[in-house]
């Protein structure tokens, strides 16, 4: 039973990483310039990504990942 739970959590972590990185790749592949695209990534001088108020796609993806990790047995 523990073996199945461990495999399930490994699958879940892999799936969440895949979802997170596919959202990043999708946004960075947009052809529009930063000024025209409300979904473009913006980076600060310290190398961290800056989320704007209208970056709801990223916020939803990151919130979903955090909620799943917090409620999973691995997060406790």
Curated annotation (Swiss-Prot):
Keywords: Glycoprotein, Host cytoplasm, Host nucleus, Secreted, Signal, Virulence. GO terms for cellular component: extracellular region; host cell cytoplasm; host cell nucleus. Glycans are attached at residue 54. Its main location: secreted. Disulfide bonds: none annotated. A motif (RxLR-dEER) lies at residues 49-64. Residues 1-24 form the signal peptide. It comes from the Eukaryota. It is found in: Secreted; Host nucleus; Host cytoplasm. The RxLR-dEER motif acts to carry the protein into the host cell cytoplasm through binding to cell surface phosphatidylinositol-3-phosphate. Secreted effector that dos not suppress the host cell death induced by cell death-inducing proteins. Belongs to the RxLR effector family. This is Secreted RxLR effector protein 31. It comes from Plasmopara viticola.
């Amino acid at each position: 039973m523990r073996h199945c739970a461990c495999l399930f959590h490994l699958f879940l972590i892999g799936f969440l990483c895949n979802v997170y990185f596919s959202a990043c790749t999708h946004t960075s592949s947009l052809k529009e310039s930063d000024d025209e695209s409300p979904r473009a990534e913006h980076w600060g001088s310290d190398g961290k990504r800056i989320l704007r108020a209208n970056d709801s796609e990223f916020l939803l993806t990151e919130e979903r990942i955090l909620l799943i990790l917090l409620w999973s047995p691995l997060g406790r």
